[in-house]
A protein has these predicted regions:
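Long, compositionally biased, intrinsically disordered segments
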Residues: 2-5, 39, 245
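Short acidic, Pro/Gly- and aromatic-enriched capping/linker segments at domain boundaries
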Residues: 2-25, 192-196
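Short, functional N-terminal and low-complexity linear motifs
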Residues: 7-14, 42-50, 171-173, 182-184
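Short non-domain terminal segments
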Residues: 10, 87, 236-237
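Short hydrophobic/aromatic-rich motifs at helix boundaries and adjacent loops
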Residues: 13-15, 53, 76, 176, ...
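Non-heme Fe(II)/2-oxoglutarate
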Residues: 17-115, 146-149, 153, 159-168
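Catalytic core of non-heme Fe(II) oxygenases with the double-stranded beta-helix
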Residues: 108-213, 217-246
Length: 246
């Protein structure tokens, strides 16, 4: 592989059309179609690097395999966020950012209970900081699933206990206690109400507030594949920003 191919520089659409999808009061998801000028280059890079994807590293909770994005890719994504997105989330400036290529691979039967329920990305952030997140869909088959957004239906203490038990109980015990079955969350349940979602589409990029509970919506896992050319490949970004001054 040439050095240029290994670095896999990406170029974002310089004139993006940004659609706002309202979710709940004060929360929205931004959707940008045709986000990259040559998205197939990133897929080819992921395929060439397939052996370097790993499970259980970078994020032990992720139901698949991950590969850190290159410095050039991360810089390009951060530049796009800073120019086109940051102010829409009232973020003053980016303090830290990282990105990675991700392939969802785990079938429902192999998921742990904490993977059966939606989650937030901004755990343990100081009050003066916020986190925004992004997902770039790099697959053509919409059946591999988009992203759904949720709000809690129960008091904070009950939700905290739910997450605690999801990490401690066996799948059978968790399902018995909470009435939640194995699988990726795709609809409301007794603990979370679905408030909206975005369908997957080739070269579609979404941004959302990381505090918003969300989940990959994968109704059937039969087509999940570890091959970047066939599987649910995404580029995921996480942006820790300083909140505006009061």
């Amino acid at each position: 592989m040439s050095s240029a191919a290994a670095d896999c520089p990406i170029a974002f659409n310089p004139k993006p059309r940004i659609e706002r999808v309202d979710l709940i009061s004060g929360q929205a998801c931004l959707v940008i179609d045709d986000a990259l000028l040559e998205p197939e280059r990133l897929v080819a890079f992921a395929a060439a690097q397939q052996a370097r994807f790993r499970a259980g590293v970078f994020n032990a909770y992720y139901p698949g395999i991950l590969l850190p994005a290159t410095a050039d890719t991360t810089a390009a994504l951060q530049a796009f966020f800073s120019e086109h997105v940051r102010r829409r989330f009232h973020a003053r400036r980016v303090l830290h950012m990282h990105s990675r290529l991700a392939i969802t691979t785990q079938p429902a039967a192999e998921l742990r209970p904490y993977q059966w329920i939606c989650h937030s990305d901004n755990v343990d952030l100081p009050a003066e900081h916020s986190m925004q997140a992004s997902v770039l869909y790099l697959f053509h088959n919409p059946d591999l699933g988009g992203t759904g957004f949720y709000e809690p239906r129960r008091p904070r203490g009950e939700i905290r206990q739910l997450y605690h038990d999801a990490g401690e109980l066996s799948p059978a015990d968790f399902s018995t206690r909470y009435g939640i079955e194995p699988g990726y969350q795709c609809a409301s349940n007794e603990y979370f109400r679905r408030v909206g979602g975005v369908d997957a589409k080739w070269n579609r990029l979404i941004f959302y507030d990381g505090s918003m509970p969300h989940s990959a919506e994968i109704p059937t896992t039969a087509k999940l594949d570890a091959d970047p050319r066939r599987g649910r490949l995404t580029l995921n970004g996480f942006f820790t920003s300083r909140r505006p001054l009061a």
